[in-house]
UniProtKB/Swiss-Prot annotation:
Broad class of enzyme this protein falls into: translocase
EC number: 7.1.1.-
Name assigned to this protein: NAD(P)H-quinone oxidoreductase subunit 5, chloroplastic
Sequence similarity: Belongs to the complex I subunit 5 family.
One biological process term in Gene Ontology: electron transport coupled proton transport
Length: 739
């Protein structure tokens, strides 16, 4: 056991040892490195697999009662300041590497096929291995300095991976947006670290947590200063975990390759902020204002992300807002003191969301064979439908992930989400209501995504098939009856004839009106020239892309069991309740309850999940009981005819335009900073530079004048004498005349 703890540093070193030679080889020997790209991928997967086995070993040691182990190595020995590196092994540390390595391996296996024809294949795997190494280094860090170093490395790798396709302007802008937004949180984190070093004189967790609480309790330090430092510390997780108001980078980060979304934005990077808050939980718990701030930030983020996902037409963006909402649940749990649930939900969510992202990648991969390489079309759910017929394995695994996120028992997310909702009710009825509302919205939009993508009939191959206009409400239009030219132009076009006004591969009005329930309905015709060379239907992905989805599907089915102890008559968690704590023992107590009480408490949340799923089925499901249209557009309109159109449009526009937050940020901050920069430029050019330039010009003229006056020529001296004599005489004459 002691030997295992002594060599824990190997866990992050293994993926690092894959990243360095791949990156160096791609720079020094690019052609040879690209020629061996599959070998490099195999090496990366193998080394991360060894790290995974070591992580499982550490986890087993901890849950069986292993001791907390810390190893420190000093950079320099100094009386006043001695920076240290090392690692800390405790139950919290031991559980995070499992999530990172298992999802990381699945993503690497998946990426080997997904990125096989990409020119940046080798570079992609170098960044991927470096990211895994950085994340593993972060979770075993014993002090704030080391955490900050790996925190920045994780952010840098995220920036590089999001911008993997940097030749696309949207991807380049997305990685810059992610980088700049995270700079705000990271700067706050740095100031908070320095502030608590001022309070405690140490960066080590074991000393810092105890010393800071003692200082606050004994009033040795101002509570305002401690609260300010804690707030600055919390800014880091707010940005990294995409919490409101620094969440705006996450949806745009979907411009990167889909496997990156599965790894960074499902299992690891988003969970890094949750890990840091959990690590510093005793410190935050001593400050009631910060705990309230954490809980409300999480609650607002959970509800905001859920509402923004309601009408997304882009498959990956819908999952991105889902990730934002679920990370809000985790922060909400930490703010309410539900420490166990807050660390249980990242585990269950990681496997479920990674499964969904990999499934979406398979869908996009297959849709590209129909619509070409165009993210606006291959990711658009309006062009999908019926994919479960052509991709049964992907459809089944996607359904498993959907049911899990909806909170349907016995899937993984049910066990953790239900506990968060229950604890939120105990903490605050308002927060409990927010959590349940977000759960209902989650079940609705996840079911909507599944029905639009996998049920019904494939819509991309429709030929002159009229569809009632109300079905386009998934784009969140301003009015349900009309489209402007601009709005029509913003709709995704089918392949073949871009920017065409004829009936060749574009959305257009058919020009006919029909009555339905006494209401005129305008039709939209999807016309698609079915070229003989185009494959008519999508195909199932290759085995190397299906295997990770199947493995993650098994995790989604059974990972929830680690939070449940099947003792007769009661439900508790030996692993999570008894061992998943820090050594400070200041955390929220989770008392066991019997099975009957548990299921009674779970009835409201499960009922909400089933109700929301049923509503999504009615609106977007494949079954048509009363009408001949196979696409259920008529039924959808008739079900909604009692709801005011204005109210529906408000909901759709709120979701489609991201709650108007991006627009507000763009007008207030982006445009404001640009205007300030322009004014600063003008002031610098015309005032600062103008004064300096004019002083120089004045000196030039004075010098030129003196040159002629002191040139040694008699005529110049005579001219100067006469000029100044005339000026003198005129001055005297004017003075006498005035008097």
């Amino acid at each position: 056991m002691e030997l295992i703890y002594k060599y824990v540093w190997i866990v992050p070193f293994l993926p690092l040892s894959a990243s360095v030679p791949i990156g160096s080889g791609s720079l020094l020997f690019p052609r040879a490195t690209r020629g061996l790209h599959h070998i490099w991928a195999l090496i990366s997967i193998s080394l991360l697999g060894i790290a995974m086995l070591l992580s499982f070993n550490l986890f087993l040691q901890q849950i069986t009662g292993g001791p907390v182990y810390q190893y420190l190595w000093s950079w320099t020995i100094n009386k006043n300041f001695s920076p240290e590196l090392g690692y800390l092994i405790d139950p919290l540390t031991s559980i995070m590497p499992i999530s990172v390595t298992t999802v990381g391996i699945m993503v690497m296996i998946y990426s080997d096929n997904y990125m096989s024809h990409d020119q940046g294949y080798v570079r992609f795997f170098a960044y991927l291995s470096l990211f895994n190494a950085s994340m593993l280094g972060l979770v075993i860090s014993p002090n704030l300095v080391q955490i900050y170093i790996f925190w920045e490395l994780v952010g840098m790798c995220s920036y590089l991976l999001i911008g993997s396709w940097f030749t696309r302007p949207s991807a380049a802008n997305a990685c810059q947006k992610a980088f700049i937004t995270n700079r705000i949180g990271d700067f706050g984190l740095l100031l908070g670290i320095l502030g608590f070093y001022q309070i405690t004189g140490s960066f080590k967790f074991r000393y810092l947590l105890g010393r800071s609480n003692e200082s606050i309790a004994s009033n040795e330090v101002s509570s305002f200063f401690a609260t300010l430092c804690a707030f600055l510390l919390f800014l880091g997780p707010v940005a990294k975990s995409a919490q409101f108001p620094l969440h705006v980078w996450l949806p745009d980060a979907m411009e990167g390759p889909t496997p990156i979304s599965a790894l960074i934005h499902a299992a690891t990077m988003v969970a890094a902020g949750i890990f840091l808050v959990a690590r510093l939980f005793p410190l935050f718990k001593a400050l009631p204002f910060i705990m309230n701030l954490i809980s409300w930030t999480g609650g607002i983020t959970a509800l905001l992300g859920a509402t923004m996902a309601l009408a997304q037409s882009d498959l990956k963006r819908g999952l991105a807002y889902s990730t934002m909402s679920q990370s809000g649940y985790m922060v909400l749990a930490l703010g309410t003191g539900s420490y166990r649930a807050a660390l249980f939900h990242p585990i269950t969510h990681a496997y479920s969301k990674a499964l969904l992202f990999l499934g979406s990648g398979s869908v996009i991969h297959s849709m590209e064979s129909l619509v070409g390489y165009c993210p606006a079309e291959s990711q658009n759910m309006a062009l999908m439908g019926g994919l479960s017929k052509y991709m049964p394995i992907t459809g089944t695994t996607f359904l498993l992930g959907t049911l899990s996120l909806c909170g349907i028992p016995p899937f993984a997310c049910f066990w953790s989400k239900d506990e968060i909702i229950s604890d939120s009710w105990l903490y605050s009825t308002i927060l409990g209501g927010i959590a349940r509302s977000a759960a209902g919205f989650t079940a609705f939009y996840m079911s909507r995504m599944y029905f639009l993508a996998f049920e019904g009939d494939l819509r991309v191959n429709l030929y002159n098939d009229p569809i009632p206009f109300y079905s386009i409400s998934m784009w969140g239009e301003k009015e349900s009856g009309t489209f402007t030219e601009t709005e029509m132009g913003s709709m995704p076009q089918l392949p073949g004839n871009k920017n065409s006004s004829s009936s060749e591969g574009v959305f257009q009005f058919s020009g006919k009106m029909e009555q339905f329930d006494g209401k005129p309905m305008e039709y939209l015709v999807i016309t698609h020239p079915l070229d003989k060379g185009d494959p008519p239907y999508p195909k199932e992905s290759d085995n190397t892309m299906l295997l990770p989805s199947l493995v993650l599907g098994l995790f989604t089915l059974f990972v929830g069991s680690i939070g449940v102890s099947f003792v007769q008559g009661e439900i508790s968690s030996d692993i999570l309740s008894q061992r998943l704590t820090l050594s400070m023992n200041h955390f929220h107590e989770n008392h066991p309850e019997n099975w009957s009480e548990f299921f009674v408490d779970a009835i409201p949340s499960v009922g909400i999940a089933f109700s929301s799923t049923f509503v999504a089925f009615v609106l977007y499901g494949p079954i048509n009981f009363n009408f001949s249209s196979p696409y259920l557009w008529y039924k959808r309109d008739s079900r909604l005819k009692g709801i005011p159109d204005r109210f529906i449009n408000v909901i759709y526009n709120w979701s489609y335009y991201r709650g108007y937050i991006d627009i507000y940020y763009n007008k207030i901050f982006t445009m404001g900073i640009r205007r300030l920069a322009e004014l600063t430029y003008l002031f610098d050019r015309w005032v600062i530079d103008g004064i300096i330039d004019r002083v120089g010009i004045l000196g030039l003229f004075v010098g030129e004048g003196m040159k002629y006056l002191g040139g040694g020529r008699t005529s110049s001296y005579l001219f100067g004498f006469l000029f100044f004599a005339v000026i003198f005489l005129l001055t005297i004459f004017i003075f006498i005349w005035i008097r």
